[in-house]
From Swiss-Prot:
One Gene Ontology cellular component annotation held by this UniProt entry: chloroplast stroma
Recorded name of the encoding gene: ISPH
Binding site for [4Fe-4S] cluster: 115, 206, 343
Entry's cofactor comment: Binds 1 [4Fe-4S] cluster per subunit.
Function: Enzyme of the plastid non-mevalonate pathway for isoprenoid biosynthesis that converts 1-hydroxy-2-methyl-2-(E)-butenyl 4-diphosphate into isopentenyl diphosphate (IPP) and dimethylallyl diphosphate (DMAPP). Is essential for chloroplast development.
Binding site for (2E)-4-hydroxy-3-methylbut-2-enyl diphosphate: 145, 234, 305, 372-374, 434
Family: Belongs to the IspH family.
The protein's name: 4-hydroxy-3-methylbut-2-enyl diphosphate reductase, chloroplastic
Keywords for the protein's UniProt record, in alphabetical order: 4Fe-4S, Chloroplast, Iron, Iron-sulfur, Isoprene biosynthesis, Metal-binding, Oxidoreductase, Plastid, Transit peptide
Organism ancestry: Eukaryota, Viridiplantae, Streptophyta, Embryophyta, Tracheophyta
Length: 459
């Protein structure tokens, strides 16, 4: 574990901000579990007054940093087009997102598949391989949550930094190596470690993600605790939390309600309990030394960009009303900062899914990586609609015969025989923001083949 020296800090960073309320308060007698903190700082331990914003500012202007590519955009986009585009999807788009192949009618969601942030990340990673054909290239995490794309990069010789017992082994990275930061971003501790190793950093972080980082840095500057709507183990949320000051991560409206009930002393719905139980519940989802009696007086909202839009908005409204009730409407601006960090691409795909479930379809096929948060929420919308919805990560989940292995929104793996009804069918189709069109086509081709065999057997 490296610790930033005073000399390095003075050379790179601006003077530390004035002491926060955390520095002024006495230490709490109850401490949160340190496991979350250790996962955030697996690569380096940073001093409390380390100016993360200034460090990031300086890093992005250094000679060993690139986030715009290397001048190979045209040829890498052509290669991606060859590998990931689909004639089936092209036909659907040319026919108003609906087309019939034999007994199968497919209705494609208006917004689906690769978002511009994902396409940008993959394209820059391809550029890095072309720019550094003979150098070792590492990824701090999967570039995106799609097994097809990740396997392609692996075949190109791009390696993931190894993980041992949940801790990344940065010792394998040497000076002169190339390290790609994925679309989800990377924790500031990881960036610091890589900068110290003098590697070439290729940053593919989605601009929407870095927008959330700016928001939590704003919270920190104003001495607000960041309430982050996300999954505490998700790469994006880990990175966002690393840029925050004091934070708590809530996965859903139920956890947000628990926090708000605690703020109101049990007067919301009575779901919360003692301070000790609060800290036990959120032991992996709070900043080190988090004290709910002190750190929930001034709060701001941020989110993992791939979470369900409606739930993020609901959480924001709930927290705002809670602070109004606790401190008075006239004082709410001193205790609450609203948010505007919902990703456009996530919102568009969710809105399109809400429209798709209103269509007359027999079932919905959701295609995307099983560790993809945004895809899980598309499946969630399908399940809530009552329409049979099947979330697969590749065409290999279909078959043999009329059988499918799919995941439910909450993660359960299910196998189902005869999932396709007999006779003519209409299928609604969508895909996650990390899913290439070719992966969707491959899945649909499996569906077409099952129905073709059905017709032949009936003849």
């Amino acid at each position: 574990m490296a610790t930033i020296t005073t000399q390095l800090r003075s050379a790179l960073l601006s003077p530390a901000a004035s002491p926060s309320r955390r520095a002024r308060r006495a230490p709490s007698s109850v401490r949160c579990d340190s496991s979350a903190a250790s996962s955030l700082s697996a690569s380096a331990s940073l001093d409390a007054d380390f100016d993360k914003k200034q460090f990031r500012h300086n890093l992005t202007r250094s000679d060993n940093y690139n986030r715009k590519g290397f001048g190979h955009k045209k040829e890498t986009l052509e290669l991606m087009s060859q590998e990931y585009t689909s004639d089936v999807i092209k036909t659907l788009k040319e026919n108003g997102n609906q087309h019939t192949w034999g007994p199968v009618t497919v209705k494609l969601a208006e917004a689906y598949g690769f978002c511009w942030g994902v396409e940008r990340a993959v394209q820059i990673a391809y550029e890095a391989r072309k720019q550094f054909p003979d150098d070792r290239i590492w990824l701090t995490n999967e570039i995106i949550h799609n097994p097809t794309v990740n396997k392609r990069l692996e075949d190109m010789g791009v390696q993931n930094i190894p993980v041992d017992a949940g801790i990344k082994d940065f010792d394998v990275v040497e000076q002169g190596d190339v390290v790609v930061l994925p679309a989800f971003g990377a924790a500031v501790e990881e960036m610091y470690t890589l900068n110290e190793k003098k590697v070439q950093i290729v940053d593919t972080t989605c601009p929407w993600v870095s927008k959330v980082w700016n928001m939590v840095e704003k919270h920190k500057k104003g001495d607000y605790t960041s309430i982050i709507h996300g999954k505490y183990s998700h790469e994006e949320t880990v990175a966002t939390a690393s840029f925050a000051g004091t934070y708590i991560i809530v996965k859903n409206i139920a956890e947000a309600s628990y926090v708000c009930d605690y703020i109101l002393g049990g007067q919301l719905d009575g779901s919360s309990s003692t301070k000790e139980e609060f800290l036990e519940k959120f032991k992996n989802a709070v900043s080190p030394g988090f004290d709910p009696d002190v750190d929930l007086v001034k709060v701001g909202i941020a989110n993992q960009t791939t979470m369900l839009k409606g739930e993020t908005e609901e959480i924001g409204k709930l927290v705002e009303k809670t602070m109004m009730r606790r401190f008075g409407v006239e004082n709410v601006n001193d205790h609450f900062i609203a948010f505007n960090t919902i990703c456009d691409a996530t919102q568009e795909r969710q809105d399109a899914m809400y429209q798709l479930v209103k269509e007359k379809v027999d079932l919905i096929l959701v295609v995307g990586g099983w560790n993809s948060s945004n895809t899980s929420h598309l499946q969630e919308i399908g399940e809530l609609s009552g329409i049979p919805s099947y979330w697969i990560d590749s065409e290999q989940r279909i078959g043999p015969g009329n059988k499918i292995s799919y995941k439910l929104n909450h993660g359960e793996l299910v196998e189902k025989e005869n999932w396709l009804p007999e006779g003519p069918i209409t299928i609604g189709v969508t895909s996650g923001a990390s899913t290439p069109d070719k992966v969707v086509e491959d899945a649909l081709q499996k569906v077409f083949e099952i129905k073709r065999q059905e017709v032949l057997q009936a003849a």
